Amino acid sequence: MLILRGTLVLSFGLLVFSPAPGHAEDFRNPEQAPPSWAQFAKLVKYRFEEWIAADETVANRFRNWVIEHSGKENGPPPTLVVRAWLNPDGTVERVNFPAFNDAGATEDLRTILKRGNVGEAPPPEMLQPLNLRFSLNLRKP
């Protein structure tokens, strides 16, 4: 869990591992997945949290949008499932999540989550995408 500026709490939780399209028979329940898969998912979660918390223009704009619109009709949902595919070198190939009502916020989050390298390669034969639960919780100061 990461507290940002004392008002916004962002957390990612591993939801499930799922296979690439066309490989449904390879699905693994998270409890049955190899430990290296769970460790890698935690690393991805940590990196996503770091990137969202970064003190830079896009991340600041996204966090401000969440703070301003949370709990409102046009605001972010309380929980968002982010599907992430990673390349063999640890870079984020793509992410997929339901769009927000604000196209700019949607693009900002997509930019943030695709911006870098998580620092490790996915474990051999790890099923993708990773499905990560993204919770936005506000705490009033």
What are these regions (language model features)?
Residues L2-G6, F17-P141:
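Charge-biased low-complexity segments
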Residues S11:
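Non-cytosolic coordination micro-motifs
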